[in-house]
Regions:
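Amphipathic alpha-helical polymerization modules
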Residues: 14-146
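Short, Lys/Arg-enriched N-terminal segments with co-localized hydrophobic residues
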Residues: 1-18
């Protein structure tokens, strides 16, 4: 993987303490933002499920992957390490949107499909577990280096 190299010891010594420059923290920051968005999406999907019988309710969703892809796509000819290190994580805000499509199974205008929502929720839970596992792995690698 491109982010296995975590630490580069800087040649500067400030006050007797060597400073460490690391892209590992950049990855952890992005993974943390992604995990936060995944957790938020789980809550939104659960809310959709709880409103399956609410007349006129329109499903909501969250688009974090699109925002991340857009931010990473700004520097097309750079390595992933470089893109991540230059990424402004404050711009990685998940966008919650309401699905106003006219497609609905029911006469009451509710557009929540319980089967789709359950599949999306299960998928999001797996994604969240993978993200938190990745964050934990990053810290384990840093700990072993130190």
């Amino acid at each position: 993987s491109t982010y296995i190299v975590f630490f580069i010891i800087c040649k500067k010594c400030i006050g007797g303490i060597f400073m460490i420059n690391s892209t590992a923290f950049d990855y952890v920051n992005v993974l943390t933002k992604a995990a936060d968005a995944s957790y938020q999406r789980e809550a939104i999907l659960a809310n959709n499920i709880s409103n399956v019988d609410t007349p006129g309710y329109k499903r909501k969703d969250l688009n974090f992957e699109g925002v991340l892809s857009q931010e990473l796509g700004r520097c097309k000819h750079q390595s992933l390490d470089k893109k991540i290190s230059e990424l402004d994580t404050s711009k990685l805000t998940a966008n919650v949107y309401t699905d106003h499509s006219n497609y609905s199974y029911r006469m009451d205008g509710n557009n929540v499909d319980i089967d789709t929502e359950n599949v999306e929720l299960a998928s999001e839970q797996i994604k969240y577990e993978a993200l938190t596992s990745s964050i934990s792995s990053q810290f384990s690698r840093m700990k072993s280096v130190l």
